[in-house]
Amino acid sequence: MTFKRREMLRIGMLGTGLSLPQYLRMHAAETPNAPKRSGIFIFLEGGPSHQDSFDLKPEAPIEIRGDFKPIATNVGGIEICEHMPQLASRADKYAIVRGITHNVPDHGLGKKYLLTGNKPSQTVSYPEYGSVVSHEYPSDSNLPTYVSIDESFVGPGYLGTQYSALTAAKPRHGVPYSVRGISLEEGLTVDRYKSQKKLLDDLDIAFKGFENLDDQVAGMDRFTEQAFDIISSPRTRAAFDLSQENPAESDRFGKHEFGQSLLLSARLIEAGVHFVTVRLRPAEFDFDTHSENFSRLRTLLPAFDRALSGLLDRLQERSLLSSTAIMAAGEFGRTPKINSNGGRDHWARAMCAVMAGGDVKGGQVIGATDATAAEPDSIGYKPDDLAASFFQNIGIESRTEFKTNVGRPITLLRDGSPIRDLF
Protein backbone atom coordinates (compact mmCIF):
# COMPACT_ATOMS: atom_id res chain seq x y z
CA MET A 1 0.00 0.00 0.00
CA THR A 2 1.33 3.46 -0.96
CA PHE A 3 0.89 6.22 1.57
CA LYS A 4 0.53 9.80 0.34
CA ARG A 5 1.90 12.30 2.80
CA ARG A 6 -0.09 15.02 1.11
CA GLU A 7 -3.22 13.20 2.27
CA MET A 8 -1.96 13.11 5.83
CA LEU A 9 -0.58 16.59 6.19
CA ARG A 10 -0.96 19.59 3.94
CA ILE A 11 0.51 23.01 3.97
CA GLY A 12 -2.36 25.33 2.94
CA MET A 13 -2.75 25.80 -0.79
CA LEU A 14 -2.44 29.15 -2.52
CA GLY A 15 -5.19 30.51 -4.75
CA THR A 16 -3.23 29.31 -7.79
CA GLY A 17 -3.14 25.75 -6.48
CA LEU A 18 0.48 25.99 -5.39
CA SER A 19 1.66 25.34 -1.87
CA LEU A 20 4.48 27.49 -0.59
CA PRO A 21 7.06 24.70 -0.99
CA GLN A 22 5.94 24.17 -4.60
CA TYR A 23 6.14 27.87 -5.21
CA LEU A 24 9.73 27.90 -3.94
CA ARG A 25 10.70 24.79 -5.86
CA MET A 26 9.69 26.43 -9.10
CA HIS A 27 11.75 29.51 -8.30
CA ALA A 28 14.81 27.72 -7.01
CA ALA A 29 16.92 27.87 -10.14
CA GLU A 30 16.34 31.58 -10.66
CA THR A 31 18.89 34.24 -9.87
CA PRO A 32 17.96 37.22 -7.72
CA ASN A 33 17.41 40.27 -9.89
CA ALA A 34 15.71 43.62 -9.58
CA PRO A 35 13.46 45.44 -12.04
CA LYS A 36 13.93 49.07 -12.94
CA ARG A 37 10.82 49.70 -10.84
CA SER A 38 8.33 47.80 -8.76
CA GLY A 39 4.71 47.84 -9.84
CA ILE A 40 1.22 48.00 -8.34
CA PHE A 41 -1.89 47.36 -10.42
CA ILE A 42 -5.10 48.38 -8.68
CA PHE A 43 -7.83 46.54 -10.54
CA LEU A 44 -11.24 48.16 -10.01
CA GLU A 45 -13.28 45.10 -10.77
CA GLY A 46 -16.75 45.50 -12.21
CA GLY A 47 -16.04 48.46 -14.48
CA PRO A 48 -16.20 51.85 -12.70
CA SER A 49 -18.20 54.69 -14.19
CA HIS A 50 -15.72 57.00 -15.90
CA GLN A 51 -18.24 59.84 -16.27
CA ASP A 52 -18.91 59.80 -12.52
CA SER A 53 -15.27 59.73 -11.42
CA PHE A 54 -12.51 61.16 -13.62
CA ASP A 55 -14.39 62.22 -16.79
CA LEU A 56 -17.45 64.19 -15.73
CA LYS A 57 -19.66 65.97 -18.27
CA PRO A 58 -21.43 68.75 -16.31
CA GLU A 59 -22.85 70.33 -19.47
CA ALA A 60 -24.54 67.15 -20.69
CA PRO A 61 -28.29 66.50 -20.22
CA ILE A 62 -29.30 65.30 -16.75
CA GLU A 63 -29.93 61.74 -17.97
CA ILE A 64 -26.27 61.60 -18.96
CA ARG A 65 -24.42 63.78 -16.49
CA GLY A 66 -26.11 62.28 -13.45
CA ASP A 67 -26.03 63.51 -9.85
CA PHE A 68 -22.38 64.31 -9.24
CA LYS A 69 -20.61 67.60 -9.70
CA PRO A 70 -16.97 68.19 -10.63
CA ILE A 71 -14.57 69.90 -8.25
CA ALA A 72 -11.32 71.68 -8.97
CA THR A 73 -8.04 69.94 -8.21
CA ASN A 74 -4.72 71.41 -7.14
CA VAL A 75 -3.79 71.52 -10.83
CA GLY A 76 -5.44 74.26 -12.83
CA GLY A 77 -7.90 73.05 -15.46
CA ILE A 78 -8.28 69.53 -14.07
CA GLU A 79 -11.54 68.55 -12.41
CA ILE A 80 -12.69 65.25 -10.93
CA CYS A 81 -15.72 64.04 -8.98
CA GLU A 82 -16.76 65.85 -5.80
CA HIS A 83 -16.61 62.56 -3.89
CA MET A 84 -12.83 62.31 -4.31
CA PRO A 85 -11.57 65.43 -2.51
CA GLN A 86 -8.32 63.86 -1.31
CA LEU A 87 -7.31 62.87 -4.82
CA ALA A 88 -8.36 66.33 -5.98
CA SER A 89 -5.74 67.81 -3.65
CA ARG A 90 -3.11 65.41 -5.04
CA ALA A 91 -3.70 65.71 -8.78
CA ASP A 92 -0.09 66.71 -9.26
CA LYS A 93 0.94 63.17 -8.24
CA TYR A 94 -0.91 61.26 -10.97
CA ALA A 95 -2.04 61.42 -14.58
CA ILE A 96 -5.55 60.69 -15.84
CA VAL A 97 -5.88 58.87 -19.15
CA ARG A 98 -9.27 59.44 -20.77
CA GLY A 99 -10.64 58.14 -24.04
CA ILE A 100 -9.51 54.54 -23.58
CA THR A 101 -11.59 52.35 -25.85
CA HIS A 102 -12.10 48.71 -26.80
CA ASN A 103 -14.89 46.39 -27.92
CA VAL A 104 -15.08 43.76 -25.17
CA PRO A 105 -17.96 44.77 -22.85
CA ASP A 106 -17.93 41.41 -21.05
CA HIS A 107 -16.61 41.02 -17.50
CA GLY A 108 -14.62 37.84 -18.02
CA LEU A 109 -13.04 38.76 -21.34
CA GLY A 110 -12.67 42.41 -20.37
CA LYS A 111 -10.75 41.45 -17.24
CA LYS A 112 -8.43 39.26 -19.28
CA TYR A 113 -7.81 42.18 -21.63
CA LEU A 114 -7.04 44.74 -18.94
CA LEU A 115 -5.07 42.36 -16.72
CA THR A 116 -2.74 41.30 -19.55
CA GLY A 117 -2.76 44.11 -22.10
CA ASN A 118 -3.61 41.61 -24.84
CA LYS A 119 -7.03 41.16 -26.38
CA PRO A 120 -8.29 37.69 -25.35
CA SER A 121 -7.53 34.87 -27.74
CA GLN A 122 -8.99 31.38 -28.03
CA THR A 123 -5.58 29.96 -28.87
CA VAL A 124 -3.19 31.80 -26.53
CA SER A 125 -3.35 32.24 -22.77
CA TYR A 126 -1.60 35.53 -22.05
CA PRO A 127 0.18 36.21 -18.73
CA GLU A 128 -0.86 38.95 -16.34
CA TYR A 129 1.47 41.83 -15.55
CA GLY A 130 2.88 40.40 -12.35
CA SER A 131 3.74 37.08 -13.97
CA VAL A 132 5.72 38.90 -16.64
CA VAL A 133 7.61 40.81 -13.95
CA SER A 134 8.21 37.53 -12.10
CA HIS A 135 9.63 35.99 -15.29
CA GLU A 136 11.90 38.91 -16.07
CA TYR A 137 12.97 39.80 -12.54
CA PRO A 138 12.82 36.82 -10.16
CA SER A 139 13.45 37.88 -6.59
CA ASP A 140 15.29 36.45 -3.65
CA SER A 141 13.73 33.10 -2.74
CA ASN A 142 13.08 34.41 0.75
CA LEU A 143 10.48 36.81 -0.62
CA PRO A 144 7.91 36.30 -3.39
CA THR A 145 8.40 38.26 -6.60
CA TYR A 146 4.69 38.71 -7.25
CA VAL A 147 1.81 38.89 -4.79
CA SER A 148 -1.87 39.03 -5.71
CA ILE A 149 -4.13 40.42 -3.02
CA ASP A 150 -7.15 38.21 -3.55
CA GLU A 151 -7.01 35.31 -5.94
CA SER A 152 -5.46 35.92 -9.35
CA PHE A 153 -8.00 35.94 -12.20
CA VAL A 154 -5.77 35.39 -15.23
CA GLY A 155 -2.61 33.71 -14.01
CA PRO A 156 0.76 33.22 -15.70
CA GLY A 157 -0.61 31.97 -19.02
CA TYR A 158 1.97 30.61 -21.43
CA LEU A 159 4.84 31.50 -19.08
CA GLY A 160 3.99 28.56 -16.82
CA THR A 161 2.84 28.07 -13.25
CA GLN A 162 6.26 28.85 -11.81
CA TYR A 163 5.42 32.50 -12.47
CA SER A 164 2.11 32.42 -10.63
CA ALA A 165 1.29 34.98 -7.98
CA LEU A 166 1.61 34.20 -4.33
CA THR A 167 -1.99 34.78 -3.32
CA ALA A 168 -2.78 36.80 -0.21
CA ALA A 169 -6.19 37.00 1.40
CA LYS A 170 -7.93 40.37 1.55
CA PRO A 171 -6.96 42.03 4.83
CA ARG A 172 -9.45 43.42 7.31
CA HIS A 173 -8.94 46.45 9.51
CA GLY A 174 -8.06 45.57 13.09
CA VAL A 175 -7.49 41.89 12.34
CA PRO A 176 -3.83 40.79 12.61
CA TYR A 177 -2.65 39.78 9.16
CA SER A 178 -0.18 36.98 9.62
CA VAL A 179 1.42 34.55 7.23
CA ARG A 180 -1.41 32.10 7.71
CA GLY A 181 -3.57 34.52 5.79
CA ILE A 182 -1.49 34.02 2.68
CA SER A 183 -0.14 30.51 2.74
CA LEU A 184 -1.38 28.27 5.49
CA GLU A 185 -4.64 26.56 6.23
CA GLU A 186 -7.26 28.57 8.09
CA GLY A 187 -6.49 28.46 11.77
CA LEU A 188 -2.94 27.12 11.36
CA THR A 189 -0.59 29.43 13.22
CA VAL A 190 3.17 29.51 12.90
CA ASP A 191 3.54 27.78 16.27
CA ARG A 192 1.25 24.98 15.17
CA TYR A 193 3.14 24.77 11.91
CA LYS A 194 6.34 24.22 13.85
CA SER A 195 4.88 21.13 15.49
CA GLN A 196 3.48 19.91 12.18
CA LYS A 197 6.87 20.44 10.56
CA LYS A 198 8.26 18.09 13.19
CA LEU A 199 5.58 15.58 12.18
CA LEU A 200 6.59 16.11 8.54
CA ASP A 201 10.19 15.30 9.42
CA ASP A 202 9.08 12.15 11.24
CA LEU A 203 6.88 11.10 8.33
CA ASP A 204 9.69 11.73 5.88
CA ILE A 205 11.84 9.24 7.78
CA ALA A 206 9.03 6.74 8.30
CA PHE A 207 7.85 6.66 4.70
CA LYS A 208 11.17 7.17 2.94
CA GLY A 209 11.40 4.65 0.13
CA PHE A 210 7.68 3.82 0.12
CA GLU A 211 6.66 6.21 -2.63
CA ASN A 212 8.00 7.81 -5.76
CA LEU A 213 8.16 11.54 -5.29
CA ASP A 214 7.09 13.94 -8.00
CA ASP A 215 7.21 17.71 -8.33
CA GLN A 216 3.69 18.15 -6.97
CA VAL A 217 4.31 16.63 -3.55
CA ALA A 218 4.40 19.39 -0.97
CA GLY A 219 5.98 19.47 2.45
CA MET A 220 9.22 17.59 1.71
CA ASP A 221 12.89 18.09 0.79
CA ARG A 222 14.79 21.35 1.06
CA PHE A 223 11.87 23.37 -0.29
CA THR A 224 9.89 22.54 2.79
CA GLU A 225 12.81 23.92 4.77
CA GLN A 226 12.70 27.10 2.69
CA ALA A 227 8.93 27.29 3.11
CA PHE A 228 9.33 27.07 6.85
CA ASP A 229 12.07 29.69 6.74
CA ILE A 230 9.75 32.08 4.90
CA ILE A 231 6.85 31.40 7.21
CA SER A 232 8.94 31.94 10.31
CA SER A 233 11.13 34.73 8.90
CA PRO A 234 10.60 37.98 10.83
CA ARG A 235 11.21 39.97 7.65
CA THR A 236 8.57 38.18 5.60
CA ARG A 237 6.04 37.88 8.37
CA ALA A 238 6.45 41.56 9.15
CA ALA A 239 5.71 42.53 5.55
CA PHE A 240 2.32 40.83 5.70
CA ASP A 241 1.45 41.76 9.28
CA LEU A 242 -0.73 44.86 9.26
CA SER A 243 -1.05 44.74 13.03
CA GLN A 244 2.43 46.28 13.14
CA GLU A 245 1.08 49.50 11.65
CA ASN A 246 0.37 52.52 13.78
CA PRO A 247 -3.46 52.74 14.10
CA ALA A 248 -3.40 56.26 12.68
CA GLU A 249 -1.51 55.03 9.62
CA SER A 250 -3.97 52.21 9.14
CA ASP A 251 -6.87 54.64 9.46
CA ARG A 252 -5.29 56.91 6.85
CA PHE A 253 -5.93 54.25 4.22
CA GLY A 254 -9.47 53.48 5.40
CA LYS A 255 -11.00 50.77 7.57
CA HIS A 256 -12.23 48.73 4.62
CA GLU A 257 -10.77 45.96 2.51
CA PHE A 258 -9.76 48.35 -0.23
CA GLY A 259 -7.83 50.65 2.06
CA GLN A 260 -6.19 47.83 3.97
CA SER A 261 -5.28 46.08 0.72
CA LEU A 262 -3.48 49.18 -0.54
CA LEU A 263 -1.74 49.52 2.80
CA LEU A 264 -0.61 45.91 2.46
CA SER A 265 0.59 46.58 -1.09
CA ALA A 266 2.72 49.46 0.20
CA ARG A 267 4.26 47.25 2.89
CA LEU A 268 5.06 44.56 0.34
CA ILE A 269 6.78 47.02 -1.99
CA GLU A 270 8.75 48.37 0.96
CA ALA A 271 9.85 44.84 1.84
CA GLY A 272 11.13 44.15 -1.68
CA VAL A 273 8.26 42.44 -3.50
CA HIS A 274 8.53 43.41 -7.17
CA PHE A 275 4.86 43.46 -8.17
CA VAL A 276 1.48 43.54 -6.43
CA THR A 277 -1.96 43.20 -7.98
CA VAL A 278 -4.80 44.46 -5.80
CA ARG A 279 -7.91 42.75 -7.11
CA LEU A 280 -11.18 43.32 -5.32
CA ARG A 281 -14.03 41.17 -6.52
CA PRO A 282 -17.63 42.40 -6.34
CA ALA A 283 -18.59 42.36 -2.68
CA GLU A 284 -17.83 45.35 -0.51
CA PHE A 285 -16.51 47.20 -3.57
CA ASP A 286 -18.77 46.49 -6.50
CA PHE A 287 -18.30 48.89 -9.41
CA ASP A 288 -20.75 46.94 -11.59
CA THR A 289 -23.47 49.52 -10.97
CA HIS A 290 -26.36 48.37 -13.17
CA SER A 291 -28.66 49.81 -10.53
CA GLU A 292 -28.39 52.53 -7.87
CA ASN A 293 -25.22 53.83 -9.49
CA PHE A 294 -25.06 57.06 -7.54
CA SER A 295 -25.95 55.77 -4.08
CA ARG A 296 -23.35 53.03 -4.44
CA LEU A 297 -20.68 55.37 -5.74
CA ARG A 298 -21.25 57.65 -2.77
CA THR A 299 -19.69 54.83 -0.75
CA LEU A 300 -17.25 53.47 -3.31
CA LEU A 301 -15.60 56.67 -4.48
CA PRO A 302 -14.72 58.10 -1.04
CA ALA A 303 -13.17 54.76 -0.09
CA PHE A 304 -11.12 54.65 -3.30
CA ASP A 305 -10.20 58.31 -2.79
CA ARG A 306 -8.88 57.69 0.69
CA ALA A 307 -7.05 54.47 -0.11
CA LEU A 308 -5.24 55.67 -3.24
CA SER A 309 -4.35 58.97 -1.59
CA GLY A 310 -2.89 57.05 1.34
CA LEU A 311 -0.83 54.90 -1.02
CA LEU A 312 0.54 57.88 -2.97
CA ASP A 313 1.41 59.74 0.23
CA ARG A 314 3.09 56.79 1.89
CA LEU A 315 5.23 55.87 -1.08
CA GLN A 316 6.28 59.49 -1.51
CA GLU A 317 7.07 59.88 2.19
CA ARG A 318 9.29 56.81 2.01
CA SER A 319 10.95 57.91 -1.24
CA LEU A 320 9.42 54.99 -3.15
CA LEU A 321 6.97 56.74 -5.47
CA SER A 322 9.66 57.43 -8.05
CA SER A 323 10.61 53.74 -8.04
CA THR A 324 7.09 52.31 -8.13
CA ALA A 325 4.86 52.24 -11.23
CA ILE A 326 1.15 52.44 -10.34
CA MET A 327 -1.91 51.91 -12.49
CA ALA A 328 -5.60 51.88 -11.50
CA ALA A 329 -8.30 50.79 -13.95
CA GLY A 330 -11.30 48.51 -14.40
CA GLU A 331 -12.29 46.33 -17.33
CA PHE A 332 -14.50 48.95 -19.04
CA GLY A 333 -16.57 52.08 -18.43
CA ARG A 334 -20.33 52.58 -18.08
CA THR A 335 -23.07 53.69 -20.46
CA PRO A 336 -23.51 57.41 -21.06
CA LYS A 337 -27.25 57.27 -20.44
CA ILE A 338 -28.60 56.32 -17.02
CA ASN A 339 -30.96 53.34 -17.18
CA SER A 340 -34.42 52.94 -15.63
CA ASN A 341 -32.90 51.44 -12.46
CA GLY A 342 -30.76 54.48 -11.81
CA GLY A 343 -27.69 52.61 -12.97
CA ARG A 344 -25.26 52.50 -15.86
CA ASP A 345 -24.56 49.38 -17.90
CA HIS A 346 -21.39 47.99 -19.50
CA TRP A 347 -19.67 50.32 -21.96
CA ALA A 348 -16.28 49.45 -23.43
CA ARG A 349 -16.16 52.23 -26.01
CA ALA A 350 -14.96 54.71 -23.39
CA MET A 351 -13.22 54.37 -20.03
CA CYS A 352 -10.37 55.93 -18.09
CA ALA A 353 -7.34 54.98 -16.01
CA VAL A 354 -5.04 56.58 -13.46
CA MET A 355 -1.26 56.28 -13.77
CA ALA A 356 1.32 57.38 -11.21
CA GLY A 357 4.85 56.83 -10.00
CA GLY A 358 8.09 56.25 -11.83
CA ASP A 359 8.47 58.40 -14.91
CA VAL A 360 4.79 59.35 -15.12
CA LYS A 361 4.32 63.12 -15.25
CA GLY A 362 1.61 63.93 -12.76
CA GLY A 363 -0.80 66.83 -12.98
CA GLN A 364 -2.09 66.14 -16.47
CA VAL A 365 -5.02 64.67 -18.37
CA ILE A 366 -4.20 62.72 -21.50
CA GLY A 367 -6.91 61.99 -24.04
CA ALA A 368 -10.55 63.02 -24.00
CA THR A 369 -14.05 61.80 -24.75
CA ASP A 370 -16.91 63.47 -26.60
CA ALA A 371 -19.66 65.59 -25.01
CA THR A 372 -21.46 62.56 -23.56
CA ALA A 373 -18.40 60.48 -22.56
CA ALA A 374 -19.48 57.89 -25.12
CA GLU A 375 -16.46 57.81 -27.43
CA PRO A 376 -12.93 59.18 -27.63
CA ASP A 377 -13.01 62.60 -29.23
CA SER A 378 -10.12 61.63 -31.47
CA ILE A 379 -8.25 58.37 -32.01
CA GLY A 380 -8.33 57.27 -28.38
CA TYR A 381 -6.15 54.72 -26.64
CA LYS A 382 -6.44 50.95 -26.32
CA PRO A 383 -5.77 48.78 -23.28
CA ASP A 384 -2.73 47.62 -25.25
CA ASP A 385 -1.36 51.18 -25.10
CA LEU A 386 -1.93 51.31 -21.36
CA ALA A 387 -0.09 48.02 -20.97
CA ALA A 388 2.84 49.18 -23.11
CA SER A 389 3.05 52.33 -20.99
CA PHE A 390 2.86 50.40 -17.72
CA PHE A 391 5.52 47.92 -18.79
CA GLN A 392 7.79 50.74 -19.97
CA ASN A 393 7.42 52.46 -16.62
CA ILE A 394 8.43 49.23 -14.87
CA GLY A 395 11.34 48.73 -17.25
CA ILE A 396 10.10 45.99 -19.58
CA GLU A 397 10.05 46.40 -23.36
CA SER A 398 6.60 45.59 -24.75
CA ARG A 399 8.16 43.88 -27.80
CA THR A 400 10.09 41.42 -25.66
CA GLU A 401 9.88 37.94 -27.15
CA PHE A 402 8.97 34.92 -25.03
CA LYS A 403 8.35 31.25 -25.71
CA THR A 404 4.98 29.62 -25.19
CA ASN A 405 4.72 26.32 -23.34
CA VAL A 406 5.01 24.55 -26.70
CA GLY A 407 8.10 26.49 -27.70
CA ARG A 408 6.49 28.95 -30.09
CA PRO A 409 7.96 32.48 -30.05
CA ILE A 410 5.50 35.16 -28.99
CA THR A 411 5.73 38.91 -28.41
CA LEU A 412 4.77 40.22 -24.99
CA LEU A 413 2.18 42.61 -26.45
CA ARG A 414 0.64 41.99 -29.86
CA ASP A 415 -0.38 45.62 -30.24
CA GLY A 416 -0.02 48.92 -28.50
CA SER A 417 2.62 51.56 -27.97
CA PRO A 418 3.58 53.57 -24.89
CA ILE A 419 1.59 56.78 -24.52
CA ARG A 420 4.31 59.36 -25.03
CA ASP A 421 2.63 62.21 -23.19
CA LEU A 422 2.62 60.19 -19.98
CA PHE A 423 6.39 60.45 -19.59
Task: Cite the ranges covered by each PLM segment.
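Ligand-binding pockets and gating/stacking loops
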Residues: 1-423
